[in-house]
């Protein structure tokens, strides 16, 4: 059974804090093994990449076969179910529409002294997209990463995807084509991350790497950060549902299980001011588990990491929700909009009973790449700005330099940086 906590209990604070800090992943000691792979690819390029692919993916390739050809992509698209491709196209269009509204504007202005200031936005030149292989290969995630990059103006989007025993998910290739991916390589793991960061004879390096992966991929992303940018280190998925007595218990149960079926380490939480609703939801979860194909995974998640938290009033739920800082926050209350305005920390908010989180996963248009493990306290979901850079612009004429220069010289000397002061003073004929 999931943990059940009541704010009326004397030990609530202690139990809630323990719940907040519980670990949902076993931290394996893989840093050294990952470092060896990354360093090997950085040093030996394609040779190391091909060796690792033989070892981990049981795939013996030559460098010339690393890249998935356009003909292979077209054949994969043709082999896909037409209705699914149509749904992916529909999702792509909505994701594009949403993210176009995020495009920032350049600005240039002149202040009271006549100094020209401003900034200019530009797209990152090349981005690498890591896509997991096997059962975790989700075509929707390809769209969520690739489409914002293309909207931002990224010229080269490079996808790497492992192909265990030579098998690639056709829908992943279809999504790559729909999303505007420029190049696709059949490699995965830490070795693929290293190839994107350092480059090989076959794979030209990129400037930023995005996309989820296993523990080795996450470790490799951490290790190459600084050489390239990265998006985030994603943890297990999570949903928090805040509901009152007006909510439908079956709908809540379905949404809790939709998160739980992702991964045994996923987390599903309900906060409610209704004990009746809490009881009904727990019963509904048990009933729905009996017909769920991924019931074993979902049950493990629900029983090990699920939670039902009872509060006296919905106002009591606000600080709890902000402390949890969930990846997904569903609000099923009589006035969901009003409650949402009190929330500071959430990756994405889903308002009302007719907005299941699954809509956001696929076709809502907003991005489903969101901060996990309470990182919504300080970070945001993936968007257009993750693929862009802002460059500041400053222009002074002689009059403006005379107005600003003396203060700059004073500060340069105060910091012991005499050459800074001199670079201004020479222009002002001051020593």
Place the predicted regions along the sequence by residue.
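Alpha-helix C-terminal capping segments
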Residues: 144-155, 177-179, 197-203, 221, ...
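A conserved active-site cap/scaffold subdomain adjacent to cofactor or substrate pockets
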Residues: 232-304, 308
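C-terminal core of ALDH-fold dehydrogenases
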Residues: 322-431
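Conserved small-residue-rich beta-alpha loop and adjacent elements
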Residues: 109-174
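N-terminal Rossmann-like NAD(P)+-binding subdomain of aldehyde/semialdehyde dehydrogenases
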Residues: 1-125
